[in-house]
């Protein structure tokens, strides 16, 4: 039996939703599992050379972690990875690997774990929920943790006229580097600012109202510290707004930038971002995408 798992890229944080809000995008990685007499990993795609093809491969580690959790020996598999989500760009590439490995293992084991159990394992591996939850479930998702540690996730309605435009530069930014610039504590005023703006953002995404989205994308917990890691950020922000964007934020830990626009302004926003980054000698791939509502899919062939 051959099992194919397709996992969407994700954009996380969306401004004020630091480490709790993310959305699945119409850009995917594919993981193909077939039982074998020995473990083997094969990776293809534009950045395949940067991905381990041995036991340290993240998708294979997730596959092995699943069986470790069950207390069973992992059956050897031939794992083929079709890599389309850019690495270390703030698009949830690690989340696709973790979800791909766990879901593939769950299928081969006969689906012993629920979505909730798979996500708890994924959050344990990833360290935060904002990418893995929408990667598995699709749509825009808010992750909420209980005092006791358990997780819940809500689907956030996303108006079809709110268009995500992703500007993906030709340089990487490791998540660890982006986290190192964050202060260890935040002021009450900044926390309150983000709470109120997150509420406004959820309303803006649901209704598509420009005035809410323009207000809501501001953040004080992570973006002010990370903007210095992204060449030309002030100019890019200004160019996006002048082209008609509701706002511009850092996608995940960066360096990809996410602009929210509408069907009329999306093309102009994409052009403005590409041309502005070129002024800083940065070649950017700009994609006008949509929210992917299916989440991870599994099929056998």
UniProtKB/Swiss-Prot annotation:
Residue ranges crossing the lipid bilayer per the database entry: none
EC number annotated for this UniProt entry: 2.7.1.39
Subcellular location: Cytoplasm
InterPro entries: GHMP_kinase_C_dom, GHMP_kinase_C_sf, GHMP_kinase_N_dom, GHMP_knse_ATP-bd_CS, Homoserine_kinase, Ribosomal_Su5_D2-typ_SF, Ribsml_uS5_D2-typ_fold_subgr
Annotated Gene3D superfamilies: 3.30.230.10, GHMP kinase, C-terminal domain (3.30.70.890)
GO terms (BP aspect): threonine biosynthetic process
Main localization category: cytoplasm
Cellular component per GO, a single term: cytoplasm
Residues binding ATP, per UniProt: 86-96
Disulfide linkage: none
GO MF entries: ATP binding; homoserine kinase activity
A UniProt-annotated Pfam family: GHMP_kinases_N
Family matches, as PROSITE patterns: GHMP_KINASES_ATP (PS00627)
Pathway(s) of this molecule: Amino-acid biosynthesis; L-threonine biosynthesis; L-threonine from L-aspartate: step 4/5
Catalytic activity from the UniProt record: L-homoserine + ATP = O-phospho-L-homoserine + ADP + H(+)
NCBIfam families found in the cross-reference section: thrB (TIGR00191)
Known function: Catalyzes the ATP-dependent phosphorylation of L-homoserine to L-homoserine phosphate.
Family membership noted in the UniProt record: Belongs to the GHMP kinase family. Homoserine kinase subfamily.
Protein name: Homoserine kinase
Lineage, opening ranks: Bacteria, Bacillati, Cyanobacteriota, Cyanophyceae, Acaryochloridales
